[in-house]
Structure formats: C-alpha cells, structure tokens
Regions:
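RNase H-like, Mg2+-dependent phosphodiesterase core
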Residues: 1-222, 226-227, 235, 243, ...
Length: 269
C-alpha cells in the first residue's frame, strides 16, 4: 500500500489535497458501454486491498467498492454508449467516458491522475502514467469502482436481452457469448463495428464474414496523431482472458491524443 500511495504523497507534500484518480473499463467487450470512474480520497486515506480491478475477483471488487464509496470525498461515473463507440471509435469513447466521470465530481479535483493517456477538455492539471491502475492508489480505486459499476449494468441488461448471458461474461467475447451470437445474432447493445475472429458483428443478421481480424473500424474523423504510441500500449488486461485477442489488436494507428470534433459534439451536454 505504501508504494501505491508514493506518487500521491509527493503531491500532498506540495499542498495538493484533492487528487482524482480516473480509469475506464469495457474497452474490449463486444457489447455494452465503456464506463469510467473518478475517485477523490482524503489525503493519506488508504483502502486496504485495493489493486488494479483486473487482478481482483468479483467478491473482492464488490467489498472494495463498498469501502471506497464509504470513504471517498467524491466519486464520479461516466459512460460512453454503444452508439457513441460506433461514431467516434473505442479509443475516443474511453476518453469521453473518463471526461464525463471527472466532470461529475463534487468537489472538483486539484489534480487528475490517469492511466496511460491524457484527457482533453478538462480544466484541471493532469498526469498520465503507464500502468497507473496498478501503481497509484486513487487510480486503482477508480478501476475497481468502474468495473463494479459496469458489471452491475451488464447484469441488469441480461433480462432485457435474454439468451446472451451478459450477467456472466459482461459482454466479453467468451465461447459462450460467441455461441449465443451465432444462435441469436447481435442485439442492440452489441458493437456492430467490432470484429471477432474474422467476423464482423452486424444488426442485420448474424456475424458476417470479414477480411481481417481487427478490434475496431475507426471513424475516419479521428486522424492519426503522434499519440498513437500511447494507444499502441492499450492495456490488453482491460479485457477478460476470452477477449484479450481483441484488445491486443486495438487499432493504435488511428488513436488521437485530442478528442475528435464528433466526441466534443457528443459531450456538449
């Protein structure tokens, strides 16, 4: 725990009190939204057992989520819908969800700590660090809260779209999910621009043939930038083991450091 607090301690000693950690989940699934959480804790407050949500089981995450919510100064949740993912691409949708989570915080942060990539369109200073979700306490807390929130959301959608097993796999590309897609075809919360093992999801029938395996057909409005290297480090651990192939093939050359005009339009509310 001491090591998880080390980076925050440096800022606390400089008089920065409200430090927000932010992280997103749901980048790799074939269905459902991207969800982000932002968490501000009191200086030097520790939630024992916190780690990157991908390294914890569901029971551990649920307990930690309660502890974090009970002790946090502020928590913000942000989502990017399937429709938004389709319009602006998965990379931009993750940034959009994180921005919404941060803008939902009250009180506001003095500093934002984020995993891997900077977020455009927020009024506070920020630091992006690779693997922050496993090395910085407040970002680890945000990872847990986001994961629990999204898992509950997918469980609530399970009876709305019966037969797919969303309560079990949470939208990731497990064998059971792929079998359900072959049997039922995609539903409205499937990401129709995603490919899985050479097949593209489509709402006009079952999975159709595709020429190559790629995680996303990127919206042409999002031009490549010098930040593509960050996207190339897209954390495949965000996906479950069954969906790791999609995450590893995330299309880094189309990632943009700044939000596209479409993303800014979507977030105009």
């Amino acid at each position: 725990m001491e090591s998880l607090l080390a980076h925050e301690e440096e800022h606390w000693q400089r008089g920065v009190v409200r430090i927000a950690g932010v992280d997103e989940v749901g980048m790799g699934p074939l269905a459902g939204p991207v969800v982000a959480a932002a968490v501000i804790l009191s200086p030097r407050d520790r939630v024992d057992g916190v780690n990157d949500s991908k390294l914890l089981d569901a029971t551990e995450r649920a307990k930690l989520d309660k502890d974090i919510r009970a002790r946090a100064l502020a928590i913000g949740i942000g989502e990017a819908s399937v429709e938004e993912i389709e319009r602006i691409n998965i990379y931009q949708a993750g940034l959009l969800a994180m921005r919404r989570a941060l803008l939902a915080l009250a009180p506001e942060p003095e500093l934002v700590l984020v995993d891997a990539r900077k977020i455009n369109g927020i009024p506070w200073p920020q630091e992006a660090r690779i693997k922050a979700d496993a090395t910085i306490h407040c970002v680890s807390c945000a990872s847990v809260v986001a994961k629990v929130h999204r898992d509950r959301l997918m469980a609530e959608l399970d009876p709305v779209y019966p037969g797919y097993g969303f309560a079990q796999h949470k939208g990731y590309g497990t064998p059971a999910h792929l079998e359900a897609l072959d049997r039922l075809g995609p539903c409205r919360i499937h990401r129709s621009t995603f490919h899985w093992l050479g097949r593209q999801l489509t709402l006009f029938g079952s999975a159709s043939a595709a020429g190559s395996v790629t995680a996303q057909q990127i919206d042409s409005e999002c031009a490549p930038t010098a930040d593509a290297a960050v996207a190339g480090q897209f954390d495949s651990e965000h996906a479950s083991a069954g969906d790791a192939a999609v995450a590893r093939q995330f299309d880094s050359e189309h990632a943009s450091a700044a939000d596209s005009p479409v993303a800014r339009q979507l977030d105009s509310e």
